[in-house]
């Protein structure tokens, strides 16, 4: 079946934010236990920042007629150094090869891309395996307490403020 990217409509944004929180919480809860506040996983502000960024394109992902996930991509049409800001596949679809098909479809949708970039938490072993071993990314940087992301406020991060930066040169 083909992968289809359907642009998000305003009325779909609450469901998109809820999906992101629910799916991103799986590894957080497995690693650290239940958080005191759901914003400890990913805040609405962070999701909204991506959704409202004029460089970002936001989609629901379908395989045929079935919704299987969502994505927010930051597309820089000047440099073609693009970023996957948010990408999720529904957990019941994990392990089926769908993620690889989705990533290939993203690459095909933006063939001018020179470099793809994304950031994922250090404890997300499933993501690390997927991006490195299945999609051909490499880890190029590690943000942590001693090496902070230049755009992130130290007060905005908490105990799990360690992230890998991945890149894939096309």
Q: What spans do the regions from the language model cover?
A:
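Conserved GNAT acetyl-CoA-binding A-motif
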Residues: 109-122
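A short beta-loop-alpha structural element at the N-terminal edge
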Residues: 4-18
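Conserved beta-strand in the GNAT
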Residues: 58-60, 66-75, 83, 88
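A short helix-loop-beta-strand connector motif used in the catalytic cores of GNAT acetyltransferases and
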Residues: 42-60, 69, 159
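Conserved acetyl-CoA-binding loop-helix of GNAT-fold acetyltransferases
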Residues: 89, 95-108, 133
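Conserved catalytic-core motifs of GNAT/GCN5-like acyltransferases
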Residues: 119-120, 128, 133-156
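Conserved acetyl-CoA binding element of GNAT-fold acetyltransferases
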Residues: 80-91, 119-120
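Conserved GNAT-fold acetyl-CoA-binding loop/helix
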Residues: 25-47
């Amino acid at each position: 079946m083909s992968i289809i990217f359907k642009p998000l409509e305003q009325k779909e944004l609450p469901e998109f934010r809820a999906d992101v929180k629910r799916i991103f919480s799986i590894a957080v809860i497995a690693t650290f236990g239940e958080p005191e506040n759901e914003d400890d996983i990913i805040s609405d502000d962070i999701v909204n920042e991506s959704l409202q960024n004029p460089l970002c394109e936001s989609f629901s992902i379908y395989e045929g007629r079935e919704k299987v996930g969502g994505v927010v991509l930051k597309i820089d049409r000047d440099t073609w150094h693009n970023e996957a800001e948010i990408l999720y596949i529904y957990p019941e679809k994990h392990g089926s090869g769908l993620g690889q098909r989705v990533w290939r479809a993203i690459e095909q949708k933006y063939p001018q891309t020179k470099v793809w970039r994304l950031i994922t938490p250090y404890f997300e072993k499933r993501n690390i395996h997927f991006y490195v071993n299945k999609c051909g990314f490499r880890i190029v940087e590690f943000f942590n307490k001693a090496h902070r992301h230049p755009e992130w406020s130290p007060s905005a991060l908490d105990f799990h403020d360690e992230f890998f930066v991945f890149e894939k040169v096309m």
